[in-house]
């Protein structure tokens, strides 16, 4: 059952922090409580009221046996969106939004069918009969399709609602949903235009803790309405002790700007980036600040690891912390939190023939 959110929980997650006052959108004024040190403070009571509206929407969607599409392509939102969608048996997009994902669903289905065909060939052993070069090309094609379409390969019809972490970042997805009259739920920061959004959730959309607590709450509301027995989040919001905003909060152009670091410090935010979420792409996630071990590490038998759904990150996440530490030492990686170790090990390992091997 969905745990009731309180203002204290949202405050602890840093959901109240908006953008600098000079970067606000005046249309967000009704959701702003005030300002401090030239930073807007979001009214968290408004956030709670808006979540109650979303709860009613979830009941309506559940009555129609509909699904939700979760969208979040920002670094700090990718893994959260995937985890939340999988928990409530819905769909997600956590890589670049492909134009026409909603408005041209038939074409997207053709690419999904291609992905299914490759998976069927792998399962039947047909790929092993092909030349090695062709096998490699098909494997690359499969990885690319899985990366962009893996979260929606079971979506046979349009979703009943679209949940977006940052509507400014995901404006194409919002525009497609509006065109098809699909209700849009979105976490709206103080720099967002709320007009295209049907269900506004005013909150900080740049920190992992804020994104996680709201996204998982939306998943819980949907799961409760559908009567789904949901597992616990793979990485809980409470695991994040640092309020790590990304470059997007300091620079609208997406590039890091040291001249604007003062704004982050005025919020009381830590400027370190050592606690990042795991990601399956090529983006590198910073690791902890502990010194790298130089001693030889004990060997680890990869054959003892049970591969889950041919997914490296999911497989590593099932391991115990001490097992991850042994693996990390084998690559001269520092001991860190579980999420960090999973992220770093994913850069050094891969899955071949349903077995984990070194790259």
From Swiss-Prot:
The keyword Ribonucleoprotein applies. It comes from Spiroplasma citri. InterPro entries: Ribosomal_uS2, Ribosomal_uS2_bac/mit/plastid, Ribosomal_uS2_CS, Ribosomal_uS2_flav_dom_sf. It comes from the Bacteria. One of its GO terms (cellular component) is cytosolic small ribosomal subunit. This is Small ribosomal subunit protein uS2. Gene3D superfamilies: Glucose-6-phosphate isomerase like protein, domain 1, Helix hairpin bin. Residues 239-250, 257-273 have a biased composition (Basic and acidic residues). Transmembrane segments: none annotated. Keywords: Ribonucleoprotein, Ribosomal protein. CDD domains: RPS2. The keyword Ribosomal protein applies. Residues 232-295 are annotated as: Disordered.
């Amino acid at each position: 059952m969905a745990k009731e959110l309180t203002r204290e929980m949202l405050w602890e997650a840093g959901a109240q922090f908006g953008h600098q006052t000079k970067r606000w959108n005046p249309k967000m004024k009704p959701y702003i409580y005030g300002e401090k040190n030239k930073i807007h403070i979001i009214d968290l009571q408004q956030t709670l009221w808006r979540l109650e509206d979303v709860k009613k929407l979830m009941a309506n969607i559940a009555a129609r046996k509909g699904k939700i599409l979760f969208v979040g392509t920002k670094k700090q939102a990718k893994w959260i969106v995937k985890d939340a969608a999988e928990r409530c048996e819905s769909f997600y997009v956590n890589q670049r939004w492909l134009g026409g994902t909603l408005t041209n669903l038939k074409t997207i289905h053709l690419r999904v069918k291609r992905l299914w065909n490759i998976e069927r060939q792998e399962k039947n052993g047909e790929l092993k009969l092909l030349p090695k070069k062709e096998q490699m090309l098909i494997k690359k094609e499969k990885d690319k399709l899985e990366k962009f379409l893996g979260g929606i390969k079971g979506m046979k019809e349009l979703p009943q609602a679209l949940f977006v972490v940052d509507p400014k970042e995901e404006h194409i997805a919002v525009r497609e949903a509006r065109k098809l009259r699909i209700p849009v739920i979105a976490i709206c920061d103080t720099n967002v235009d709320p007009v295209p959004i049907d269900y506004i959730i005013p909150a900080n959309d740049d920190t992992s803790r804020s994104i996680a607590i709201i996204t998982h709450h939306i998943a819980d509301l949907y799961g409760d309405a559908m009567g789904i027995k949901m597992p616990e989040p793979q990485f809980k919001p409470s695991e994040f002790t640092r309020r790590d905003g990304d470059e997007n909060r300091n620079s609208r152009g997406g590039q890091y700007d040291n001249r604007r670091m003062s704004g982050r410090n005025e919020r009381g935010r830590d400027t370190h980036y050592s606690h990042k979420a795991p990601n399956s792409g090529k983006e590198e996630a910073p690791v902890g600040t502990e010194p790298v071990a130089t001693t030889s590490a004990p060997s680890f038998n990869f054959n003892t690891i049970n591969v889950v759904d041919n997914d490296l990150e999911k497989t590593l996440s099932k391991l115990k912390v001490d097992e991850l530490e042994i693996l990390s030492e084998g690559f001269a990686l520092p001991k860190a939190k579980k999420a960090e170790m999973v992220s770093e090990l994913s850069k050094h390992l891969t899955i071949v023939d349903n077995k984990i091997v070194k790259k």
